[in-house]
């Protein structure tokens, strides 16, 4: 198998801030197959120390768009917002800044003080990728509707994964979010991008399996 040099871990810089920001790609487009074969796309874009993550999932009758954005500080992605948009309308949203978070379904927002780091599940996927499976200190998770404590992250072994006509090794992790479990997997030889994201929210199970990768506009294969 031809190993593709990881794009997330290849650049060095003089300062910690620029080094950590440079380890993320300028852009990434990840195509997934979801539950029942439903297509999903996640894009990551970076401009300087700002980032944006957009995940589009097509479900029966409507589409879901999860969007978050913020800044890169050291080795941490710091969201300033997260939106859950369904059928073109904002279903839930979180706004973060100044040690506070305003979150909730549309028309049901509330504000709380927060400390440590608060991320959504898609931002956390890239956080774990760039930080080699390590959680930021004091992490909480938001899905726009609620705020969850994280009860730990455990390595869950490695496996062979088929993608784009080849195979590669993935490293698996299990995260406890409140009373539910989130499963992640990453492919070190393919830029350590998220290859699997599986979780349940509002009674719906999302099981995303990576099918193709573009990093900085170029297709990446095993």
Where do the model's predicted regions map?
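Beta-strand/loop-rich accessory regions of lumenal/periplasmic or secreted enzymes
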Residues: 126-132
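N-terminal signal peptide c-region/cleavage motif recognized by signal peptidases
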Residues: 14-18
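Bacterial N-terminal signal peptides that target proteins for export
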Residues: 1-8
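Acidic/charged, solvent-exposed loop-and-adjacent secondary-structure segments enriched in E/D, K/R, S/T
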Residues: 102-124
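Acidic, serine/threonine-rich low-complexity disordered tracts
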Residues: 22-98, 133-222
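Absolute protein N-terminus
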Residues: 1, 20-22
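Long, intrinsically disordered, low-complexity accessory segments associated with secretion
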Residues: 26, 124-125
